[in-house]
């Protein structure tokens, strides 16, 4: 059974860690809403609140749980 709210996945263009996390979530059948900070710079402030100022992706927000750069990350 899929959760009602999609998982938020913050990424940037050209980030191999982001691509790996996207593929992992897709393989698990998880509904994902991807937010690319390269294409949407207006969301950077929102992301920095989530990461407490760390400029790194990928960031996964699932319910109340936040994973910052699981398995490695790229700065932006």
Predicted regions and their residues:
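Non-catalytic, surface beta->alpha helical segment in thiol-disulfide oxidoreductase systems
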Residues: 61-76
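Solvent-exposed, flexible loop/coil residues
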Residues: 21, 41, 61
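Structural micro-motif
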Residues: 51-63
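Residue-level recognition of specific faces of alpha-helices
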Residues: 17, 43-46, 59
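Local sequence-structure signature of Cys/Sec-based thiol-disulfide redox active-site neighborhoods
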Residues: 1-33
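Glycine-/small-residue-rich active-site loops that bind phosphorylated ligands and cofactors
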Residues: 16, 39, 67
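Thioredoxin-like thiol-disulfide oxidoreductase module
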Residues: 36-54
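Residues that form or flank phosphate/diphosphate-binding pockets in enzymes
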Residues: 19, 42, 70
